Design a protein with these regions (language model features):
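Glycine-biased, small-residue-rich flexible motifs in mid-sequence functional cores and linkers
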Residues: 2-125
Length: 125
């Protein structure tokens, strides 16, 4: 899957306005896909990587409801709660975005590659 990677620096057009008030925010973001629009309502859903079935179901449920009501979901693309939240947002026909602990040129964990692909195809990042 080819998806252009780009960078946006603090103070440049495209850098998220909601991050500007914080002095310790990154000076540069590396992006694959898209960033949420400044006017887009967002909610973060995070949790354990090794979690119960109930935990996964709740992450997916809340993400689906939020997405169905126009709220973009942000999580980390890790196994467990994060992946469940992204899946739920996609089921809710919404956009979902990942904040990664690795480079945007790889998918970690590899088993979430199909999920990452669907996120990008759906206009997320």
């Amino acid at each position: 899957m080819a998806m252009e990677i780009f960078t946006v620096g603090r103070g440049q057009e495209g850098y998220p306005e909601r991050l500007m008030p914080f002095a310790d925010m990154p000076s540069r973001l590396f992006v694959r896909g898209a960033l949420p629009a400044d006017e887009q309502k967002t909610a973060a859903i995070v949790g354990a990587r090794i979690c119960t079935a109930y935990g996964k179901s709740q992450a997916a449920f809340f993400a689906q409801v939020l997405a169905a009501n126009g709220v973009a979901v942000i999580s980390g693309l890790a196994c467990g709660s994060d992946a469940a939240a992204h899946e739920g947002a996609l089921r809710g026909k919404g956009k979902t975005f990942a904040v990664l602990g690795c480079g945007v040129d790889i998918c970690y964990p590899k088993q979430n590659y199909p999920l990452m692909r669907r996120m990008l195809e759906n206009g997320g990042g």
